Regions:
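Vicinal oxygen chelate
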Residues: 1-8, 13-22, 33-36, 45, 54-56, 94-153, ...
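Short secondary-structure capping/turn segments at boundaries of alpha-helices and beta-strands
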Residues: 31-36, 48-49, 67-69
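Peripheral, non-catalytic segments flanking oxidoreductase cores
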Residues: 59, 64-72, 131-132, 141
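Conserved acetyl-CoA-binding loop of GNAT-fold acetyltransferases
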Residues: 26-32, 102, 172-180
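Short, solvent-exposed loop/turn segments that connect beta-strands within catalytic domains
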Residues: 41-42, 52-58, 194-195
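Short, solvent-exposed loop/turn segments at the edges of secondary structure
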Residues: 42, 57, 76-78, 152, ...
Length: 235
């Protein structure tokens, strides 16, 4: 089996770069780890947000393409990005998101996790997972959110597929994830990574999604070294 160590980063598509920056740094309290350009489109920024050290598994990046139409997340796409926050931060985040008129969902449970959902300014579906493993991880103490409540990293991502099987096989056979259970039409896969350890696939029989603002561009996975990366690439 070709092992990876979970999610390395997730890249999504945004609209206005200033609006994106203000939301992820001032509302969610993430650190702007790096600002560079899209190497395939040098006229476009590439914005990286993460924890204090910019560790793999904490980084969400964006290509802000203002001219692009709004996307329609659906089958064949990643349809949600989840962050880990401490369990004691639940009321803080509910109050914060409501105060900022972000209309968070009521707290709901999935695979035993307590979660709230909301959207960023471009409509990207986000979740905060009140994760016991985050309770023992320090938060960034220089951000807009107090350290005790700060986002710790990426928890995982949700994919929508017509048939979860082929993607599930890839996760298990080539990327080192283990099948962790089923809840209705949702299937969970888990790695042993500290951050970015969860991929969930929902069986979705609706229309194919359309890329655009507010959708995920790609998910990158970690490999232990160059040799392991080459092995995975050959499979």
């Amino acid at each position: 089996m070709n092992q990876t160590n979970g999610i390395h980063h997730i890249t999504a598509i945004a609209g206005n770069p200033q609006q994106n920056y203000e939301f992820y740094t001032q509302v969610l309290g993430l650190r702007l780890v790096k600002k560079t350009v899209n190497f395939d489109d040098p006229a476009t920024y590439h914005l990286y947000y993460g924890n204090e050290a910019g560790e793999a598994g904490t980084v969400l990046t964006f290509f802000p393409w203002e001219h692009l139409h709004k996307g329609k997340p659906d089958r064949g796409q990643a349809v949600a990005v989840s962050f880990s926050v401490p369990t004691a931060s639940k009321q803080f985040w509910i109050d914060r998101l409501r105060k900022l008129n972000l209309n968070p969902t009521e707290v709901f449970k999935r695979f035993g996790d307590e979660i709230i959902g909301f959207q960023d300014p471009d409509g990207l579906h986000l979740e905060l997972v009140f994760d016991p493993l985050s309770d023992n991880i320090n938060g960034w103490n220089a951000g807009a959110v107090p350290a005790q409540h700060a986002i710790r990293g990426i928890y995982g991502a949700t994919l929508a597929e017509k048939n979860y099987g082929p993607t599930g096989n890839l996760l298990e056979q080539d990327l080192g994830f283990d099948y962790a259970g089923q809840l209705d039409n949702r299937h969970r896969y888990q790695s042993d990574a500290r951050f970015g350890s969860i991929i969930e696939i929902i069986d979705q029989f609706g229309p194919s999604g359309q890329s655009g603002k507010g959708t995920v561009h790609h998910i990158a996975f970690r490999a232990a070294d160059d040799r392991r990366q080459e092995e995975i690439g050959r499979n």
